[in-house]
């Protein structure tokens, strides 16, 4: 969901929406650096005076105006808070067995768009991917980036967290609260007839 607004020429345009992990407050300045600044200034080619929407995961959207564009930074003025897309009252943690490459990315993307509150990757018996150390840290950063991008595109103002992977039996031994669900083709209870509390953990294979 991309909001609409007026350009500096009075033409209706799509307003770009970006994540920024800084405090945002109406009447205060904001600054984008690095990849965000490059994407906004060089890829999207916004100009001074253009409108942009920022969010930082606090559940709010913020209407901003571009004040200055430099090679590595973009300065903005935070004007006001905007109504954000409401979050689901059902808090779902997706417990996903780590899968290869694009399959894991697709799971994170689509579950974020559908309203998942958090992700807990797990190592199960059939998992083919095993990561440790710096490789695992880079993969976690990549996964979190996939989630952020899905929030930018879907209009969510709360960013689900991606936790560090644990072994499946370790997760199963932890007290998580709420209800734990495992989808099974031969189960006698269907999702349509089930009642859930406010917190659910959904385990997905392989």
Where do the language-model regions lie?
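N-terminal positively charged helical leader segments and presequences
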Residues: 1-83, 134
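Structural motif
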Residues: 16-17, 29-30, 51-52, 74-75, ...
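Solvent-exposed alpha-helices and their adjacent loops that cap or buttress functional pockets
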Residues: 24, 44, 86-87, 173-175, ...
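A short acidic, often aromatic-flanked loop/helix-cap motif at beta-alpha or helix-coil junctions
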Residues: 24-26, 166-172, 188-190
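Short glycine/serine/threonine-biased micro-segments
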Residues: 47, 57, 99, 153, ...
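RNA substrate-binding interface of SAM-dependent RNA methyltransferases
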Residues: 79, 84-182
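A glycine-rich beta-strand to alpha-helix segment
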Residues: 194-206
């Amino acid at each position: 969901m991309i909001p609409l607004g007026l350009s500096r020429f009075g033409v209706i345009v799509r307003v770009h929406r970006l994540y920024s992990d800084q405090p945002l407050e109406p009447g205060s300045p904001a600054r984008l650096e690095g990849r965000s600044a490059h994407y906004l200034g060089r890829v999207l080619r916004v100009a001074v005076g253009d409108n942009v929407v920022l969010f930082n995961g606090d559940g709010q959207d913020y209407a901003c105006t571009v004040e200055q564009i430099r090679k590595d930074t973009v300065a903005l003025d935070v004007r006001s808070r905007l109504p954000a897309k409401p979050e689901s009252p059902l808090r779902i943690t997706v417990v996903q067995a780590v899968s290869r490459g694009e399959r894991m990315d697709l799971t994170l993307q689509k579950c974020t768009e559908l309203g998942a509150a958090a992700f807990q990757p797990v190592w199960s018996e059939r998992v083919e991917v095993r990561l440790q150390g710096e490789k695992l840290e880079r993969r976690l950063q990549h996964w979190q980036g996939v989630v952020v991008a899905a929030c930018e595109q879907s209009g969510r103002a709360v960013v689900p967290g991606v936790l560090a992977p644990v072994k499946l039996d370790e997760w199963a031994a932890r007290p998580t609260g709420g209800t734990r669900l495992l989808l099974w083709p031969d189960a006698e209870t269907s999702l349509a007839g089930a009642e859930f509390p406010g917190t659910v953990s959904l385990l997905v294979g392989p």
